[in-house]
């Protein structure tokens, strides 16, 4: 392991408290002035090991006084903040898309905690002075540079001393709960998980987040891309702190700024904007940039007090693993709270009821958006989230970044297993593992493993023990090898295997059925049209074609009519097709879909299932 330089910063408190000041985060009515003084500290033993050429240290300590009491703030660089293939995209005045891969690994965004305080946390930017927030003795404090000429002065203040931008409570636009949440939480909490389910819940999960900034927000910050970047980095850094208790790690995989014009129609009606953004992600973003979830930050003022909206229980869905958030506050912590709330909906969590609580402070999933950066998930939210994970098991969250992809030096205690490490359970103060040595990031004596579906009581599970049950007709169960803590790669039924009571045939691990495809396009209550619609619509250019050649729609042969444009019905409306966007596959019957007894759609042709694969 590479020894890391520890840096101690001493804060000298200014002899008076300010009465009122305008800071970058807003008007502050009461604050303390402190002067950070950086004091290098040698590692234990007095020998300073060579360090890689970096601008910012991996680990730092800050010592200062809060209300006259000395505290030590430990900080560690959030090495999981950016994905290994992070990109930034903006647009030239002529509309050209410009995408770069900036070197962001030597960044200045940190997580931390107050020494000797169990329930403390921090999210700090050290890019230009110290900016962020930390929790001390149950209260949230903010720190921010005063930016006075020839001065290193900073302000420390509490949330209650920030002048509110308006008195109207901010709310989330989600009004309907998912059907799975109709069961009372009290009843859910009485259910007992199987050992396999408990192991799945304990596995670390990762969300690769793509953030889009619309044109109005871009102009609100004087068309300054650097200012936008820093703002988004701070938000995602805070988002990470809020999701750590759920065992989720959020990596920013891309940031896109619509610097020329908006790429979708953004309206004050939040549901319309959400739907448009979801379609854009599916048809435009995903083909060029993989991601697990996308959030749109907008400068528009949504109708009423609404500042965000998301689909519920849709993580990993191409069109619905999205959220839209109004950039409703100067303080990044407040917007980050809204981002956390809407992502919670994507993860299957509904609004908390009156019986839910978070011990102290506001709950993240309250229908009224919290202005506290360290609000927590209630026990109701945790149970609801776990129920969603066990029911749906979204696969995209299990894509763990490879240790070889992390290019910065390894740091023991940051929860990421990196080069030279066999486990990483966090700092010695935070480590909850009986199998991992938090100081060395090696297994404890005689331990074979720390975590994984095939790890039990620090030992590999026996060969043949099931580690991943079949989740549906097209999936196969996996068993441990006895030689590894990891469950073998997910495997599927052969293509052409009957599924869903012979309604379809398996194709690449899924059971494509027209009814489900109609629901994905048109929402609940939509069904596939009768067979005669597929014959009638062959004479309608927009709905009766199998492929497009040189801009011309080619009609389907009679035998292939069920493999072209998908036709759906809802209520009295029959034979509905969905207009083709610039994505030629949008609204088409998916490959592998059943088009007759013993027949499937392959390359827009209805062929015998025995010869198709």
Curated annotation (Swiss-Prot):
Its EC number is 3.4.24.-. GO terms for cellular component: extracellular region; plasma membrane. Pfam families: ADAM_CR (PF08516), Disintegrin (PF00200), Pep_M12B_propep (PF01562), Reprolysin (PF01421). Residues 409-495 form the Disintegrin domain. A motif (D/ECD-tripeptide) lies at residues 473-475. Snake venom zinc metalloproteinase that may impair hemostasis in the prey. Ca(2+) 1 binds at residues 208, 292, 396, 399. GO terms for molecular function: metal ion binding; metalloendopeptidase activity; toxin activity. Residues 561-574 are annotated as: Hypervariable region that may play important roles toward cell migration. Its cofactor is Zn(2+). PANTHER family: ADAM A DISINTEGRIN AND METALLOPROTEASE DOMAIN, DISINTEGRIN AND METALLOPROTEINASE DOMAIN-CONTAINING PROTEIN 28. This is Zinc metalloproteinase-disintegrin-like MTP4. GO terms for biological process: proteolysis. Binds 1 zinc ion per subunit. It comes from Drysdalia coronoides (White-lipped snake). Keywords: Calcium, Disulfide bond, Glycoprotein, Hemostasis impairing toxin, Hydrolase, Metal-binding, Metalloprotease, Protease, Secreted, Signal, Toxin, Zinc, Zymogen. Zn(2+) binds at residues 341, 345, 351. It is an enzyme of class 3 (hydrolase). InterPro entries: ADAM_Cys-rich, Disintegrin_CS, Disintegrin_dom, Disintegrin_dom_sf, MetalloPept_cat_dom_sf, Peptidase_M12B, Peptidase_M12B_N, Reprolysin_adamalysin. Monomer. Glycans are attached at residues 282, 437, 572. Residues 21-191 form a propeptide.
